[in-house]
């Protein structure tokens, strides 16, 4: 088992290597372990309500849409909703479908004063495989981490 300190150092090194504006980037397994080990850590799932309902949810995650369904319009209340549900001092892990929206959400959170933000690489479903299908290459579900059907 890797210690919390080791995981956060690895995530921070990725952030430096990739020139990310937030604290770090974690694989789904690493993120799940950080969530388990870090007191008060919060996992914020920024997918849409449709994705939570039709694709699946992570039990215990805070759910705040980064973009709204249908139309994928930016959620103008994202930061206000984040402030209502997550303390600015908390370690915050951002998760989306494949790691793109969560990257934007983590960046926005840092700009809003959240100093301990991490992106979950690969997201909930991971990237598409050679046949254009998700959940076969990377992602929270593919890693066998806790989730439930919406």
Regions found by a protein language model. Name each.
Residues 94-95:
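Short, surface-exposed ligand- or partner-binding patches at beta-edge/loop junctions that are enriched
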């Amino acid at each position: 088992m890797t210690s919390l300190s080791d995981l956060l150092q690895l995530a921070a090194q990725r952030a430096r290597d990739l020139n990310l504006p937030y604290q770090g980037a974690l694989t789904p397994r690493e993120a799940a372990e950080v969530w388990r080990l870090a007191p008060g850590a919060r996992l914020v799932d920024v997918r849409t309500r449709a994705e939570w309902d039709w694709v699946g949810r992570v039990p215990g995650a805070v759910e705040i849409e980064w973009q709204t369904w249908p139309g994928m319009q930016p959620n103008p209340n994202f930061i206000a909703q984040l402030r209502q549900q997550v303390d600015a001092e908390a370690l915050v892990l951002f998760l989306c479908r494949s790691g793109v929206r969560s990257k934007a959400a983590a960046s926005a959170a840092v700009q809003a004063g959240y100093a301990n933000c991490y992106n979950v690489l690969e997201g909930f479903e991971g990237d598409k495989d050679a046949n254009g299908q998700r959940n076969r290459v990377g992602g929270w579900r593919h890693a066998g981490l806790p989730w439930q059907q919406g």
